[in-house]
């Protein structure tokens, strides 16, 4: 089944209207000038319709702030009837569901940004991505932003696990949805891939702020710098198309609605224009899981080829040739190296600043180890002529 390209979304240049009460929702004139001159992300649809509340939610005591937001968003709900559910799978932010009906048909998710995550995530860009994906039918409703987070619609369905995403009927749906997102246009601009910009920024943070306290299990900064240069030199030559990517498609970011027979992706903090092969390779790495990482679960070649065939045929609307599938297979596995490196750097930064209960240092070491383990084999993959 072909996935038709999405029409470009009309936009105005850096659509944001200044609201003095909430600095998160504003751009200064200087920021607009800088963004216009060297924009890593094409602007999305106008954001004027999204309320921004001057409310800060305490990370350690979310409920009072969440209820203040609910009074604004659902004034007809009686406070004593509001139920809550805490989601604890996230390792970047804290998430609370607020609802009154048992079936959670009308449910507001309150997401509180993790400490210091502005070092890792462009929050204005996240909101642009949210609205861009919503405009193309790929995201839930965004209800509001507040000083340190946002509220949005709860998507019905179940978050998948590593055991689910390797099932053929489900990975076909995932491939189709990714193909759909990858067809979102860049509003007439020629987008740059975010990968190198973000990776260099993360590396600079690690080098300048964190390196003196690094564990002996982490490669030395000089080694990381060499590997980053090697990645950029080799992967930039692969001619992977730059498309709109999710960039963080771990299992729990995939919601399966069995009633409607589709999947949707959630959490757009890292979304943006990037290499097609990075998005797919990153997802394949996530077959290993996050809390209990096991790279024995990395998809076998046969599974990858079938997944990639579904993806290409959805994107093209015609049958994919064996050469096309093999070419994408080589690109994807090479870019999966960059995914290991990217999230290892990310984890080192999180280890320094995050208050989430997760062993980020251990995770960084696991990702670096896997990078160096598979690098020789992946580097030897030849691109089909």
Curated annotation (Swiss-Prot):
| One Gene Ontology cellular component | cytoplasm
Q: Which GO terms describe its molecular function?
A: ATP binding; ethanolamine kinase activity
InterPro entries with a match to the protein in the record: Kinase-like_dom_sf
Question: Quick check: keyword Transferase in the entry?
Answer: yes
Q: Which GO terms describe its biological process?
A: in utero embryonic development; multicellular organism growth; phosphatidylethanolamine biosynthetic process; placenta development; post-embryonic development
Q: Which Gene3D superfamilies match?
A: 3.90.1200.10, Phosphorylase Kinase, domain 1 (3.30.200.20)
CDD domains with a match to the protein in the record:
ETNK_euk
* Enzyme class (EC, first level): transferase
Q: Which reaction does it catalyse?
A: ethanolamine + ATP = phosphoethanolamine + ADP + H(+)
Q: What does this protein do?
A: Highly specific for ethanolamine phosphorylation. Does not have choline kinase activity.
Q: Which family does it belong to?
A: Belongs to the choline/ethanolamine kinase family.
User: Under which name does UniProt file this protein?
Assistant: Ethanolamine kinase 2
Its source organism is Rattus norvegicus
């Amino acid at each position: 089944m072909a996935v038709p390209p999405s029409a470009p979304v009309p936009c105005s240049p850096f659509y944001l209207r200044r609201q003095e009460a909430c600095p998160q929702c504003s751009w200064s004139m200087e920021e607009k000038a800088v963004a216009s001159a060297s924009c890593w992300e094409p602007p999305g649809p106008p954001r004027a319709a999204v309320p921004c509340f001057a409310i800060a939610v305490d990370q350690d005591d979310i409920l009072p702030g969440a209820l203040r937001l609910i009074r604004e968003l659902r004034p007809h709900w009686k406070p004593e009837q509001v139920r809550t559910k805490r989601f604890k799978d996230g390792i970047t932010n804290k998430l609370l569901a607020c609802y009154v009906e048992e079936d959670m048909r009308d449910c507001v998710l309150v997401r509180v940004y993790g400490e210091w995550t502005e070092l890792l995530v462009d929050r204005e860009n996240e909101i642009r991505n949210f609205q861009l994906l919503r405009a193309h039918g790929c995201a839930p409703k965004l209800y509001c932003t507040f000083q340190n987070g946002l509220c949005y619609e709860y998507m019905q369905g179940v978050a998948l696990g590593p055991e689910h995403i390797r099932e053929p009927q489900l990975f076909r749906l995932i491939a189709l949805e990714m193909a759909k997102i990858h067809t979102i246009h860049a509003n007439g601009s020629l987008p740059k891939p975010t990968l190198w910009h973000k990776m260099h920024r993360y590396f600079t943070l690690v080098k300048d702020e964190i390196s003196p306290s690094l564990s002996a299990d982490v490669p030395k900064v000089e080694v990381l710098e060499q590997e980053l240069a090697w990645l950029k030199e080799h992967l930039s030559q692969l001619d992977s198309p730059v498309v709109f990517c999710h960039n963080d498609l771990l299992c729990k970011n995939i919601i399966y609605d069995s009633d409607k027979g589709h999947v949707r992706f959630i959490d757009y903090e890292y979304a943006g224009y990037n290499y097609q092969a990075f998005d797919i390779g990153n997802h394949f790495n996530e077959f290993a899981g996050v809390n209990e990482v096991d790279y024995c679960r990395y998809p076998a070649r046969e599974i990858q080829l079938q997944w990639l065939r579904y993806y290409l045929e959805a994107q093209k609307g015609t049958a994919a040739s064996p050469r096309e599938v093999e070419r994408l297979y080589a690109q994807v596995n090479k870019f999966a190296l960059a995914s290991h490196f990217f999230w290892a750097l990310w984890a080192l930064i999180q280890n320094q600043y995050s208050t989430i209960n997760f062993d980020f240092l251990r995770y960084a070491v696991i990702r670096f180890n896997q990078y160096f383990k598979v690098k020789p084999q992946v580097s030897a993959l030849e691109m089909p002529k």
